């Protein structure tokens, strides 16, 4: 019966279900530094596999190497014999004294887009060691609509520069790899946050704006708390400046920026100041290589304010499909990234 029904409708069906036209690339981001690192290997280009390449037919063999041998320890009886000793000691102090603070920077690509993976990672730590708040959130984000840990909206007149495709920004990138400008002199640029639905993100704790230095001393922002409209002036005197908007937790916050052109805006931080906090710095299309362009002085200023105890790098997916099994070029590039992070976040 089903076959007869299908044959009867076949003449009405299209010849092809999927269009052969190229889809929109509006939301497809390309890591320019990844392409540069790949192109910088002249010998590698000639090794790219084709359909007739004999290398493609060779089986992958994993050979034993004289690398670092990790002890066979389980999570339950981990003794900290590796590189995480300071981090676990800080967690121990937090667990025993309830006074220490721990902060984690989680850098990733589209795998952590919309706070995926990271929100569970954050919840686990906050459930065990305390702490409330979603952490640092950018001014704009391509994944704002899919994020449940915080509701995020913004106006369309923000000028955005990302370390993914801008090598020489107008001003230094923030710890999130972005810098934003409210350059529209006619309409005020705005950003709105609303507390999420997860257990430890039901309020916006200690909303604090992070912004950079500029000659413009006339920048202002306005926002409402209850029925009161509050106006504050930006003082962009230092490499990194902070402005606390409320000492009491809020359910939502909408901030309007006026006369703030040329002032680099980085984002807002939301945390209660105790326990563990995790900042998700995800970026679609990122290979991790752009981190090597962080400005050391600016990052040290962020470290003074946020004090990261652990940095997680979650990359690799965007490096695949370049037609080669030789990833030494990526190894060298990521070594530069890690060395730069050590400069930016000493300790």
Question: What is each residue range found by the language model?
Answer:
Residues 1-41, 170-208, 212-221, 227-229, ...:
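Alpha-helical cap/lid subdomain in secreted, periplasmic
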Residues 9, 17, 30, 48, ...:
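Weak global preference for isoleucine
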Residues 75-158, 162, 194-284, 296-307, ...:
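Serine-esterase "nucleophile elbow" of acetyl-processing enzymes
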Residues 27, 31, 41, 50, ...:
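Serine/threonine-rich low-complexity intrinsically disordered regions
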Residues 162-172:
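Charged heptad-repeat coiled-coil "rod" segments that mediate homo-/hetero-oligomerization
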Residues 36-106, 174-176, 184:
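Membrane/wall-proximal cationic-aromatic binding patches
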């Amino acid at each position: 019966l089903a076959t007869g029904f299908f044959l009867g409708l076949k003449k009405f069906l299209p010849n092809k279900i999927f269009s052969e036209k190229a889809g929109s690339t509006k939301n497809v981001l390309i890591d320019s530094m990844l392409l540069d690192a790949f192109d910088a290997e002249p010998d590698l280009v000639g090794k790219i596999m084709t359909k007739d390449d004999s290398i493609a037919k060779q089986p992958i063999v994993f050979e034993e190497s004289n690398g670092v041998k990790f002890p066979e320890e389980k999570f339950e009886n981990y003794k900290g014999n590796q590189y995480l000793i300071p981090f676990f000691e800080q967690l121990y102090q937090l667990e025993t004294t309830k006074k220490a603070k721990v902060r984690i920077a989680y850098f990733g690509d589209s795998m952590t887009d919309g706070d995926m993976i990271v929100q569970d990672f954050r919840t686990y730590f906050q459930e065990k060691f305390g702490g409330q708040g979603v952490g640092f959130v950018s001014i704009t984000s391509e994944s704002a609509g899919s994020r449940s840990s915080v509701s995020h909206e913004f106006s369309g007149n923000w000028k955005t520069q990302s370390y993914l495709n801008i090598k020489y920004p107008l001003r230094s990138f923030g710890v999130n790899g972005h810098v934003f400008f409210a350059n529209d002199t006619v309409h005020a640029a705005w950003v709105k946050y609303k507390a999420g639905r997860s257990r430890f993100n039901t309020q916006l704790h200690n909303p604090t704006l992070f912004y950079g230095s500029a000659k413009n001393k006339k920048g202002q922002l306005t926002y409402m708390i209850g029925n009161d409209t509050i106006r504050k002036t930006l003082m962009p005197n230092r490499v990194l400046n902070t402005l606390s908007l409320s000492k009491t937790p809020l359910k939502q916050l909408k901030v309007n920026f006026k006369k703030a052109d040329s002032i680099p805006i980085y984002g807002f931080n939301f945390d209660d100041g105790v326990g563990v906090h995790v900042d998700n710095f995800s970026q679609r299309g990122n290979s991790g290589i752009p981190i090597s362009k962080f400005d050391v002085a600016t990052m040290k200023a962020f470290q003074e304010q946020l004090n990261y105890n652990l940095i997680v790098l979650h990359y690799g997916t965007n490096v695949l499909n370049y037609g080669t099994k030789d990833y030494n070029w990526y190894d060298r590039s990521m070594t530069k990234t890690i060395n730069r992070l050590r400069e930016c976040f000493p300790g």
